[in-house]
From Swiss-Prot:
Highest taxon of source: Bacteria
Residue positions binding Mn(2+): D11, H191, H193
Protein name: 4-hydroxy-2-oxovalerate aldolase
GO terms (BP aspect): catabolic process; L-leucine biosynthetic process
A GO molecular-function annotation: manganese ion binding
Length: 347
């Protein structure tokens, strides 16, 4: 049976600058539970401890968000996203105290070693620990397998490949998921973003390649161009004969019900989202890039290219300002030198 992890109340928070209310969290968690969703993930878009001036502040803290969801769930498991460095061991302790069932410990795709203590902390408490490799497009299959094996050794009960930038195509997804499925003794999952319009297709390919866990959000509510749309994914999974705890009818009832308390607008694939997917940048960076381009008066798409050259990962918003400022200085020098580009002068 395929496990569906619903990130609406976590990744969806990115789409509204992390402003979900307690009432919205309670209503959606209750509805998702009634729809038969396996895991309901809750929190700031960047996970436990993510609320900050840099990443965006939530109107309510982690404790209230998790307590609210916990009270609403009966059969669905409560999950959280945790990035070492943004969150601390104390944040996991709080989550476990409240009754979180699944802790998804997420690292950059080449930094799995920093997940060890947090996976072990979760397992010691008798809860489920998943490892998550973010920005998975930035590493080849063998590297991802080596990193996933570390998480498996630390005690992770599954490893999820996260296509954080929406960069991947079906062939890339198949190669990476197959490599992990063949090389691990634990389940493999996949988390897609829709920057290139491939979220559902990539999720189906991941399942064909042996993945047993897929992430999705109601109406695609999520960072950038959105996540895999839950309703569309479940419909396609039914067509392909995949067995789950839910049905298309139940998730459609869930989606329609959100119009009274959440009403997430179905994300459109804007040019900026396509650019972030094409250049392999974290989907949540788009509003920050647009703001910096406007403030410094630089070309937005040139800024995407520069940031791609820096190989940004999540949590490096300060580099967006740094590169926008550098582009602005180069533009000013170019004007002062009669149109000669700074990079030409330094070549």
């Amino acid at each position: 049976m395929i496990l569906i992890s619903d990130a609406t109340l976590r990744d969806g928070n990115h789409a509204i600058r992390h402003q979900l209310s307690a009432a919205q969290i309670h209503a959606y968690a209750r509805a998702a539970d009634e729809a038969g969703i396996d895991v309901v993930e809750v929190g700031h878009g960047n996970g436990l401890g993510g609320s900050s001036c840099l990443l965006g502040q939530t109107p309510i803290g982690d404790r209230l968000m998790l307590e609210t969801a916990r009270a609403a769930l009966r059969t669905s498991r409560l999950g959280v996203h945790f990035i070492p460095g943004l969150g601390k061991a104390a944040d996991i302790s709080l989550a476990l105290e409240i009754g979180v069932d699944v802790v998804r410990v997420a690292t950059h795709c080449t930094e799995a070693n920093v997940s060890a203590r947090f996976i072990e902390q979760t397992r010691t408490a008798g809860r489920t620990a998943f490892g998550v490799l973010m920005m998975s497009h930035m590493a080849p299959p063998d590297t991802l397998l080596a990193q996933a094996k570390l998480m498996e050794r630390y005690g992770a009960q599954a490893v999820v490949l996260m296509d954080s930038a929406g960069y991947s195509t079906p062939s890339l997804v198949r190669a990476k998921v197959e490599r992990l499925v063949d090389g691990l003794d634990i389940d493999v999952g996949f988390h897609a973003h829709n920057n290139l319009g491939l979220a559902v297709a990539n999720s189906l390919v991941a399942l064909e390649a042996g993945a047993r866990i897929v992430d999705a959000c109601v109406k695609g509510f999520g960072a950038g161009a959105g996540n895999t749309q839950l309703e569309t994914l479940v419909a396609a999974m039914e067509r392909e004969g995949h067995d789950t705890r839910t049905t298309f009818e139940r998730v459609m009832t869930l989606a329609r019900g959100t119009e009274t308390f959440l009403n997430p607008k179905t994300p459109h694939i804007q040019p900026a989202n396509i650019a972030s997917g094409l250049y392999g940048l974290f989907s949540g960076y788009v509003p920050h890039i647009q703001k910096a381009a406007q403030e410094f008066g630089v070309n937005e798409f040139e800024l995407y290219k520069r940031l791609a050259e820096r190989k940004l990962v999540a949590g490096q918003e300060d580099i967006i300002i740094e590169e926008a400022s550098r582009l602005a200085r180069e533009r000013d020098v170019q004007r002062a030198t009669g149109g000669v580009r700074v990079r030409e002068l330094s070549a």
